[in-house]
Amino acid sequence: GHIAERLNSDYGFKIDEKYTDLDNYDRKTYEDFYIGSMGRRVGEAYGGVDDFTLITPKFDTDYTLYEREYGGEKVYEGNFNDAILTKSYLEEKPLETNRYAVYHGDNAELEFVNHNVEDGKILMIKDSFGLPIYCFLSTGVQEVRALDVRLFKESIAEYAKANQPDVVIILYNADCFGGTMFDFNAKQ
């Protein structure tokens, strides 16, 4: 809820508190389900196996999600669970599988259109740590566009001009801070 609070207080958004209240979400925990990024670095013996909690809205949702990469586009429509979740990440897979990718993860460009909210456009420039965040931000605004600079090779500056977001959020894991993550493929 901290990002939503800041968007409301500093940027004029009107994100309803119901979208940030955890009581308005279902939670299902999968025990001993994956090895997190630190565990993958140090090994299962040192890092252990983590639980994963899937969080989904209890309230009504209605989305169109556009997934664009490699010159193609896939369109998903329906509620949060049908349009946004990639349920194959909840199936039995190796422990090293990134379970957070269930929140429609690691694509060059995603556009979430929330048909239940009338305003608020966010452009998020992110790495894999943004996966669940853009999904949950999308519950309270009309549009979230998420770009992964590791995969998106066009000019992000031109993309922002063309799509006119109300705010741009840059969300990276601290380990990723470096020159290439701030290049934005801007044309000089």
Show where each model-derived region lies:
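Extracellular glycan-modifying ectodomains
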Residues: G1-Q188
